[in-house]
Amino acid sequence: MSKLSLFGLFGLVIRRDLLLAMRRRADVLTTLVFFVMVVSLFPLGVGPEMDMLRKMAPGVVWVAALLASMLSLGRMFSADYLDGTLEQMLLAPQSLSMLVLGKIVAHWMLSGLPLVLIAPVLGLQFDMPAQALWVLILVLLLGTPILSMIGAIGAALTLGLRGGGVLVSLLVLPLCIPVLIFGTGAVEAVNTGMTIVPHVALLGALLLLALVFTPWVTAQALRISME
């Protein structure tokens, strides 16, 4: 591991996690199927009230994305913890924060990116206009990585604990509320003819802050959990 550059190891962590995920495709599909089912149930329950569906759409999609992301958080570090890979990462001469960031990126590519791609199709069920769909894609691209980064902290803190999945949700959900507010606010702003700039700017700022701080915090949480 010491012969690899920092960014080379970062890419290796991403490729490794993606390859392992392809061997467990059911885990990846579970998140996507859950997201599709939750979003699709609302139009069936509400009925053909298009005005109501358009108003509900941003909140429904974001809440479903948040809950779907919770499903896969427990798997972010558990396999590496069980097979000893995590111990090797802790002992590696390279920055643990960078290795953690690689795992977060891989987690987002497997759980967040598919939601971003399928969300516009699901938005058609709510009769969302084209402009609102584009904004939905934009805010999901900004917001879902934040969910993965915040979730990584919770996953690291509850690593190896019984009932860790429930604890992760209790830790992570309150921290994700700002993302939920700004993400839904941007789409609602389009529907009401207002500017989306403040919402998008705040989401971008949250993304940058999370990118700077969460890998380091997650790395420290992993060290504590492994002691």
Locations of the language-model features?
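Aromatic- and glycine-rich beta-strand/loop motifs that create alpha-glucan
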Residues: 1-31
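Hydrophobic alpha-helical transmembrane segments that constitute the membrane-spanning cores
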Residues: 101-126, 146, 150, 183-184
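A structural motif at transmembrane helix-loop-helix junctions in multipass membrane proteins
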Residues: 134, 139-173, 223-227
